[in-house]
Amino acid sequence: MRKLLALLTLLAAPAWAENTAQETSFWAMEVQSGDLPPIAERLPEVPLVVDMEAKGRSFGTQGGTLRTLVSRTKDVRQMVVYGYARLVGYAPDYSLYPDILRDFEVFEDRRYVLHLRPGHKWSDGHPFTSEDFRYWWENVVNNDEITPTGPPDFMFVDGNLGSVTFPDAHTVVFEWPTPNSNFLPLLAQASPPFIYRPAHYLRQFHLDFAETESLAEEVRRARVKSWAALHNKRDNLYKFDNPALPTLQPWINASGRSSRQLFVRNPYYHRIDARGVQLPYIDVVEMTIVSAGLIAAKANAGEVDLQARGLDFPDISILKKGESDGGDYRTLLWANGAASQIAIYPNLNFRDPVWREVMRDVRFRRALSMGIDRRMINRALYFGLAHEGGMTALSSSPLHDPADLTSWATLDVKRANALLDEMGLTGRTPAGIRKLADGRPMEFVIETAGERQEVENALAIVTDTWRELGIKLIMRPLDRDILRNRVYAGVSMAAIWFGWDNGLPTPATSPKYLAPTNQEFFAWPKWGQYYQTSGSAGEAPDMKDPKRLMQLADDWSHTFDPAQRSVIWREMLDIHADQQYAIGILSEAPQPVVVSKQMRNVPETGIWAFEPGAHFGIHRIDEFYYENPLQQVTQ
């Protein structure tokens, strides 16, 4: 059946004849000079043909430059997120379809046969074949120097390592002894495991292929310690920071100044429309790096053509005013897919043993949650338009339970104080601050990424109500990367961030992210490290309910009954709501999306979510175009 669905997706595409392929004007000179082959030779034998009419979209005109902003140099990786070329991808209804793949076959949810598109090429024109998967498998993840930890955890099911075979140039087979039903959704993620590599490019940095003396010279010039470090530095399809690394994304990194990155259309991209016009429609993406605090102002000033990253609900008023004052843009309001707009994460792996014991007591976490005036925060920061409550599945998810949203989430200072008293935290300083068991004042430090004014404003309100509990809140803004590293190391007492990326789960969604399987869940970084490294780092979970979450996640992977999976999901969500590992404050506040008035095929409504959906990715940014692209050129 899964094979049939994949093939039907292919057959439903509109007919296309190779001789109708239209050459893009952007690469016309290179084609005329012989530096590039003509369009018919650059496309796969069977390209992915987009049916614009079926999607309710219009055919576009090639050309123009899309301007967007990011706040950090490393955010060039957003081009891989937005571009969203994946082996399989999510459609807007969250069904999976073959994208880079021509099709796929699934047998018993444990054997996956991936069929590549004959004639598909990397951005430098080299064939994309099963050899690129072989290189990843044999020469990267199974090379002890490049990957000391061995194959990634998704290749193991029930402790058994899967196999990867390569029957021919256009077929790759992944197989496990038992079902691995999360394999395809994993490939469709915003930040997927890239299970292929441009072997023809990377071999020059690999000891098994490169000439020893020339490789040693490359290592010296790159100022790294080993050939493996050099290989890893050159090889990152997600970071997108090596312009020489071939890609399959719609745009390729053309470098540029450090503060202004340029990306130009991939001449070998595999998607076309029914007229034979190669996507993406837009020729160039100009990504400018600015201070996070300037993004809204620059959007208001008309310096972007497409922007949502770096914009928050409080920016809507200034954006709408600029629009009404004659700005050449529209401000769309999309839904937000994160499980919580703002969530506080007490670190259960904090290295201070006294504080760690306090935070591991569920009464403390419940008291913190009941000491938050969510209604005041909603009215003050979101004009009452957000949903007040804890972190759980959003209202549009079939797994949403209103009881989980409200669990321990109603302001009740009296009850919160009673819980803290029950813990024995009855001693007070002259200023009324409770004392820890060792006599220290209860000063609760929450570290932030310092990027969102709404977070700091919310914490200012929380400070006042927590003071009534005898808890002094101290806010510490940090750089995002420093914050993450402190949390992972166990030196951060608590952090504030969004809720789960995926607030829209279905029973078919893997619930692993609700269990201690990843250090990126700030409540249990050490437990996540333990799972991710198979016990070589971090700490094993040593609390009852987190262990139960691990068991439930494992149970989910061993059943394929939707009803049973739903039962598992609901128990896991109930545990989170009851235990308050992450203390959600608000959710579902509208996400502003600034769009040039000249841009077409942009959805009026959508969901802004990293996972699933890759932000703009699921909405196919390669199909966006300008009404008059000649007016949209880079300066």
Task: Please identify what each model-predicted range represents.
Residues M29-S33, P37-E108:
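N-terminal lobe/hinge region of extracytoplasmic solute-binding protein
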Residues E53-V81, I100, F183-P192, W355-E357, ...:
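A structural "hinge/loop" feature
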Residues G63-R72, R102, R111-H115, W136, ...:
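Short, well-ordered beta-strand elements
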Residues R102-T147, F183, K298, V358-R360:
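Aromatic- and charge-enriched surface segment that lines or borders ligand/interaction sites
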Residues R117, Y238-N242, Y268-K320, R366, ...:
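Ligand-site clamp/hinge motif
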Residues V140, E145-G150, V164-T165, I252-Y268, ...:
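Extracellular/periplasmic solute-recognition and catalytic clefts
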Residues D153-L230:
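Surface-exposed binding/hinge segments that line
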Residues L245, W251, S255-Q261, R265, ...:
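Detector for C-terminal structural segments
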